[in-house]
Structure formats: C-alpha cells, structure tokens
Amino acid sequence: MERGLSVTEQKLAEKLTILNERGEGMLTRIYNIKKACSDPKSRPGFLMDKALEPSIKYIVRKFPQMDTKATQLQAVQSIQNEVMKGLSNYYFTFVDIMEFKDNASELLTAIDASFVHFDITLNFDLTKAYLDLIVTLTALMIMVSRVDDRRSVLGLFNHAFEMRNGRSEESFPRLGQMILDYDSPLKKLAEQFVPHQQRVSTALQSLHEIYLRKSMTGEQWRQGQILSIINAPANILVPGQSKVPAVEYLEVSVIQRWIMFGYTMCHQQLAMPGITDIWKMALQDGFCITLFRDEIFMFHKEFHNMLDGMKGYGKRIKDIQDAANQMAASVGIHKERRNYLRSALTEMTLILADQPGLLGPKMLIILHGLSIAHDEILWLVRHCCNPAPRSRKLTQEDFFDSKLPHLLFAVEELRSMVQKYSSVLQRYFIQYLSGFDVYMLKQVVQKISICSEDISLIMTSFIDELSSLSVKQVESGELFHFSGLRLDWLRLQAYTSVRGSSPELKDNRDLVELMNNVVFHSKLVDLQDETLAEVSDLSIFCFYPGFFEESFVRCLEDITQSRYCIAFPLICGHFMTCTSDFCPEERHPIGDRSLSAVNLFLDSMAKEARNIMSQVCSEHIQQHQQLWHTHAVRMMTEMASERRTKDKNKKNVHVEFKPPGIESFRKSRETLTSLDTKLLSLTELCHAITHTEAIPVWEHIFAPKEYLSSQLEEFFAKAVVSMAQYDIDNQRIARPSEVLSNVKAMMSSLRSLENYTGVDTARVFNHVLLQQTQPQDSQGANTITQMYTTWYLDVFLRRVMTDGIVYSPRRMAFVNRPGMPFRAEEYTDVNELQALAELLGAYGMRYLGEKMMLQIASQVSELKKLVIMNKDVLVALRTNFDKPEQCIELIRRLRNMDDVMLRMIIIGVILSFRQLIQQALDSVLKTRVPYMMSCITDMRKNFPHGNNDRQVVDEMATSAGQECVVDPLLCAALRTLKEKKSEDDILTWSLLLVFVAVGLPSLAYKDASEYNGELEAHDNNAHCISSSVNSITGALCSNNGDNPEDRLREFLAITSSSLLKLGMEAEKDLKARESVYLLLDMVVQQSPYLTMDVLESCFPYALLRNAYHEVYQKRKEPFL
C-alpha cells in the first residue's frame, strides 16, 4: 500500500465487503470440489483412469516441479484437450482462491498500516467484517488442504496446458507453492498473522464481555427473563433498546469461531492476562465448530497438533487437554438452554399471535431469541452428526434431543409470524426512521464541530434520506433500498477508526449508538428476509440428510412431539438460501434435494395419519358390526352362559359379557383405551398437517392437506375393495348390505377428520365412490363394480342353472332349495340389491347391465346358429302349424330343441335379474334424487316415440333404473348380430320365435317344469321364458324395423296350437302340462304388445283357469 493514499482512497469498507462476499463464494466452490473428489460417482474420470495412474503418481510425487518429457506423462498426450476441459473449473477455482488469499493479505496489511482501531461495541460493522475475513481466510485454506486430489488435479491440468501451449499456465508456479505451503494450514497462517496480531487482539478483546454474557446457562436466562416480553407489563410497548442492536442477535458460534481462530492464529497473545481464560472457555464448548456447511473443525486435536513442538507452549497444550476433559459438561448446559428456549419461544409466539402489533417494539427480543435458538440447533446438529473423540466418555445418544422438533417448530412459528406481518414491521420502522431517528440524528450531527468534507457529505445524506421517508410509501407498495445508507455508515466507521482521523469515532459514541439503531431499523424495512435468514436459517439440515430424516421419523413416532413434525417440511424451504451466485451449478441439486425431502416428509405424515385412521376405522367398524342382527343369537347365548358357568369347586366363575356400547362407560378419566391413544395421536398429527395451508419450496407450492386427501382417497378406495372380500378361488364375496354398512361406518369415522383437519371428506368420498362405479379406478385396479359384476355373472347366474336356484317373482328374489349351504336370497332380495345399487351407483349398475346384455347376445348368437341349422324345417312349421300330422312330423325333424329352450331360459334368468337390479336402482335414485327422477319419468312418458331422440331418452331412463318398452342396452348388444339384408334378418328372428313356440310343449315332459305356487315360479325357471321372448322380440324388431306385435301374435298362435296338442295326449302322464299352459298367460301379461283378447282368440281361457287351479292345489316342498 502506498502511504500517500488518504483514508477515503484506501476504500477499506468496500474491500472488506467485497472480499467477505467473495470469500463465501470461494468456500462454496472449494466445498463442492472437495465433495466431488471424495465421491466416486462425481469424481473426475481422469483420476480413476487406470491408463493415467502412472502419470498421476508421478505428478503427485514431483509436484510442483515436473519434467514434461518424462515417459510417465506420455499417456496424457492423447487426451490433453479432454483433461483441460474436464479440470479447468477445478484448476481456476484454486487460482481464484490464491488471488483471494493475496487480496485478503494485502488488505490486512493495509489495515495494520492505517492503525485501524477495532471495537465491536464501537464500530460493529467494521469489526465484524474484519473478523469475518480472518475466519473466512482460515476456513478457506483449511478446506484447500482437505482436497485430497489437489496436487493431481492441478498438476494434470498444468501438464496438459503445457503440452498444448508449450508453456506452463502463468499462475501455476505460485499456485503450486501455495499448495505446498498450506499442507499444514494453521501453522502457515499463524506465521502470516504475526504482523496482524495487534489489530486482531484489539478486536477480539472487545468481544470478551459479550461472549461471557451470551454464554450464560439456561437457568440464568430464565432468572433474567431475557426473552420475555411481558416481564414488565408497564413497559410492554416500550421498544427494545440496545447501544449495538446487532450484538444482541450475534450468534455465540460466530464469536466462538472468531475467538478460537483469531487467538490461535495470533497465539503469541495467549500469554496475556484475560485472553487465556476466554480462549479456554471457548475450547470447553463441545469438540467441534463449523468450517462450512457440514465440514467441521475438531479444534482440540487440531490446535494441539499445531502448538505441539513449539517452545513455550506446554501450558497452552495443557489448557487444551483440560478443556477437552471438561467438554462433557457442555452437553448438560446446552440441554438446559434448549429447555428454556422451547418454553420462552412458545410463550412469545402465543403473545405475538394475539397481539401482532408488538412485533415492532419487541423485534430486537424476537431476533435475539431466534439467534440463540439457531445457535443451539446448530450446536446440537454438528455434535450429533460427528462422532466424539474416542478418548471422551460420550456417545452420540448423549447429544440426541427427543424434543428438538418442538424447538424447530417454535423457530418456524416466529419466522412465519414475522413474514406474515411484514407490512406491520415496515410501517412501524419507517415511522421510527422518519421520526425519532432523524430527529435525534440532526441533534447529534450538530454537536460535531470538526469533520472532513467527505464525512460531512455522508452525514448530510443520512439526514436527507431518512427525512424523505413516509408511511404512504409502504401503503403504495414501494420498494425500499437502504443498502447505500448502510455502506456509507461502514465507510464512515472506516474513516473515523483510523489513527489520527478527525473526528474519531470513539469520541462520538452518541452518533455510534444512534447509527447502529438506524442500521438495525433499516434492515427491518428492506432486508426482512435476509435478517431472518441471518438469525434462523436452518439450511444446515440440507447437508445432514440422514440426521434430518431420522429426527423426523422419531418425531412422527413420538406422540408428544408429532404435532411439531410439520417443522421438517417447513425447514426444506430454507435450503435454497445456502446457495451462492459464485456456484450456480449447485442450485439444481440442492433444489431437487429440498423438493424430494419436503415430498418425503409430507407423504410420510399423510401415510401415518392414514395408518392411524385405518386402525380407528377398523375399531369403529367392529363396534358397528356388533349391532348387526346376525350377532344377536351369539349375544343371547353369551348372556345366558354367564349364569351357568361354574368351576370344579362350585364357585361361580362369571364369563364377563361386554354388550355393545360398554366402551362408552369410563371408570376414570386417566385410563386411556387403545382407541383413545389412537385418537390422541391422530389429533396431534392432524394439528401438524393443518398448521399451514401451503409450503413454498424452490418455486413450488406444497399443500399438506392435499397429501392427506390423496392418502385418504387411496386408503378409502382400498378399504372399500377389501370390504367386498372377493375370493376368486373359492368364488365368494361379501353381501352388498354388509359392505354398504361397513362403508357407511367408515365414512362416518372419516368424516370426523373434518373436525381435526378441515379436509373436504365429501370430495374424498365422491372421488373414490365415483371411481368405484367404474370397472377400474384411476390406478388401473379392479373396483367393487368389477368384482360384483364378475361374481353375479360368472358365479351366481351359473349357479342358478346348476344348483337348482329359482327366480321368484313373488319374493322378488332368487331362492334355492333347503339344505344348500349357499343362500341365493342373501344376495338377491330387495335389501341386498338396493345396497348393491347404492354401492355401484347408476354407472356401476349400467356397467353390470351392459355385461349381462353381452351374455344375452352370446346366447342369442348360439340360438341364431341353431335356427339357421333348422331353417328349412322351421319355414315349413311356420306355414303348417295348424296341420297336426305334418306338424308332428316336422317337429320330429328338429334338432337341438332342448338346447334352444335351455338357452331361452338362461336369457330369461339374466333378464329377470336385470329387472331386479333396475327396480333396486330406481328405488334408490327416487330416494336420493327424487326431483331428477320425476323429470326423467315425465320425459320418458311424454317424449314422442317417433322422434329421432327417443333412443337417447330411453337410454337415460334405463340408466336411471326405469323400465322402457325396448331396452336400449339389449338393442345395442344384439345389433352386432344383424344381417346385411333386413329381409334375411327378419326371417331369421321370426323363425327363432317359431322354434321357441313349437319347443314349449317339450317342457311339459319334464318334472322340473312344474309350477310352484308359493314362489309363482317353475322349478327350472321356465317362467323366465316369458321375459326372454318379449324382450328379445322387442329388441330384434327395433333393430331390423319389423313389427313386434305381428311377430308376437304369430308366436302366440303357433304356441297355442302346439300346447293344445298336449291336451289330446290324455294317455300320457304329463305332470307339468298345466304348468306349461301358464307360460302362455305369462307371455301375454308381460308383453307391452299383446292383450288378453288376443290370447282368448287362440287359446281357451278355461284351460288357463283350470291350470291355475290345478297348480295351486299341489303342495310343494318349501323353498328357503
């Protein structure tokens, strides 16, 4: 430095500011290089290339003097461009660090030459910047020495550069020497700091009182009520005051680093009185300090190694050993501090939430509380995540704090409070600056009689800038920028702290005190986020992911701490604050890490809530099931057995019977049941989930409630499906009424979540149950619609034909013979099918109907094949049905008549079941949406039949469970069987009716065709033929344009003729003859096209009357 430069030309303030900012950037870059070189996945490939291994060994051995013509280096020749491209970022980072070191050394020398006086209580910003530069330089050089591949990287790059350009890279000689010098960074730095020890010692001595005050125990804090804003109610509105506000929220760990590194670099000062005590006190606080992020410095070991071997430092080494031995006491001290902070910060949060106007006057206390909480959290993290020295009787569990989540939550609460009321703070401190501060500043400036022009201009600018402020600027949303004011104050500190300056800062403490407060107030206007980050940034957890996740898991499992687990995803929003503009490439990795962490935490919280809720729902369902009528007999048996049970000694042994609802009677409030514990856990967890509506993390917004909603949807969907208990192998499924009852019980339990979380459970139910009406849900999994459709069609309807199950129109259900283990009525009566309609909804019932229609279409397709096979005979029968002899002969020529009748019965059974589910759906919808159903009914009845949109109306009505003359689903299913020529199609389906008509008498020869009056059904379900004939005829005629009434009249005529021939066979014992006669009446009664007049014109009514009389006289074995 030239001695001719004036104090203003030296620009000490500007240089300190720039170098500190650049030093942080250099630390970030060297940190990433160290991590990259230590990780095999990110390590430069050249360093692991087997072909380059001899070259690298040679470079490391000869570094920095290497012979470029050495044979070991020939392998680099072919890849010199790739080496330079791959290692240039690494190399020039070291070059930048060397330049930073040179600039920092030059500035420290200039400061010494100017005899700058440092005092943290006088020129805080200048002193802090000076000490920060010393610590940053020390940490940077230690980090350089920790990069294991530094010699190989630098030497390899320089050799490739020299091979390409014919000369060494210009910075390499100095860079190589720096690498050699700083292999032992502490000793080298101590040598360099010999000229600076006077300035360093002066700055550090001003910290002694502050460090002692900040190192008090938790009990001393509690007695002093240092964080209480209501300890003096009369002064609750009085602003927090301090001569140097920034000192109040200056962290102990920062002071500790200043003291440790400062005095150790200037170890000659340790012999001076008072300095040793403060240095030893710092050494007793744990066993490590933070260098940068998760890089720590084991100071006992490192300082011991540094001083070992130096003459006259045996006593200092003994002090280090004593401090290490007393380290265990710090664990209890920090634990006591955290206990106090939890209660103090919680109290502060509650008061400020009730009275946010106190944020302004008590902001200094808030920042103080956040800073010491932040300090304690960082101390705990670095000591938990780094193993203690083996010689110390400490384990990692000694440092672990199960109540850490509570402290993290308290910090986050205070942060969110400050951020929420940002405008309140701005209004308060703008008024403070433009009122009290500027008034006092004018008076203080007037007292200064002698000052240079530069200083006069700076102080005048202070007054002008503060005088121009007004609250209207806050109301209009104007952005404030006080960075220039703060930099001018730093310049003023530098100008007036130099020996011989006029005026000297130490002679104007009123100005110092006032400007320190002005700077503090200005930061709370334009740098609120930065100030909060300074005292409460928890981005350190980004670099301790294992500890972060482990703490979260423990918090989630601890019922007393689970309400605070929301702090962990909130902390993920801090991660991006640790990034640096000097290393933009790390933004995406850190951002991705923050996103994955917050997603993991919120997902785990939602899953835990879901798991607890599933257990609660299971217990509620069990309690609900105790009220089912199926459990009534067992309950009565258990009640009776209480009175009869005795042991061998004739002593009464009561088997305690617990009736439903007994759990509601409590003997004491203290006794918690398992359900109580689960509900308590759920309440605590839901409190965490609902703590905030949104969590911003790296340009993303996360909504905790949405995670819970998605988990509840997934859980509810799986629960509904599991309630069906569908067993494919054993072909079993739960009764729809039981499933519906369980679903309603679960919905009732889930609905209680609204009391805890405000989650819209109605949306969850609608979303899940709507998906359950489809064959597959959004995840592609089978739903209850698919399961019940498969079971009813592939299992139940098959059993109808094979196990003797009968459709009873009288009971409106399918029933089976007594003694069978399977009860068809339990799945097909009115209550069950209405329950099925509620579960499947209109969409699900339509899907079930479509699948039934496909089965009918399959049967009709087979019938069509049989008709075509017998086409010639059927054509002849159609024209000669009134000629007995010819007709009998033609009937004998027909093939597969029994097959035709069986398929018609199958179709009829499917259609009968279809009718039952349609009636159930209609009943349910009339209860649920009566207005809409009345509109559909009116439209179905009054919409013109000739209109082109009539089919749409019928489809709507059918989907709502209403009966139409022609089923549109059946029409659509049979449309695929239509012939190209309508004449051929009409003929084919007309012949099918002829086939059925002449085949009906064959049923009279089967005993299974007898009619059961109690069920109003035939034992072989022959009565279902009436449904199949009417429905198929209507659908086929609708598709091909034929007249269904003509076809049915023809069918009636042929059937009547065929059945009347049975009466002439008196010599044969046809038990089912009268039962078959009834089929004709059923066809007419169910047909929308035929009337009894038409029937009487071709079949005597007397025969029907006698047939009904005959079948109802018979007594059949009852069906159950």
Curated annotation (Swiss-Prot):
Q: Which cysteines are joined by disulfide bonds?
A: none
Q: Where are the transmembrane segments?
A: none
Keywords, comma-separated and alphabetical: Cell adhesion
- What GO cellular component entries does it have? SCAR complex
Signal sequence range: none
The record ties this protein, via InterPro entries, to: Nck-associated_protein-1 (IPR019137)
Among the GO biological process terms of this entry, one is: cell adhesion
User: What top-level branch of life does the organism fall under?
Assistant: Eukaryota
Q: Which organism is it from?
A: Nematostella vectensis (Starlet sea anemone)
Fill in the subunit field for this protein. Part of a Scar/WAVE complex containing brk1, scrA, abiA, pirA and napA.
Family, according to the entry, reads as follows: Belongs to the HEM-1/HEM-2 family.
Name of this chain's protein: Nck-associated protein 1 homolog
What is this protein's function per UniProt? Involved in regulation of actin and microtubule organization. Involved in cell adhesion.
Is 4Fe-4S tagged as a keyword?
Answer: no
The record ties this protein, via Pfam families, to: Nckap1
Entry keyword tRNA processing: no
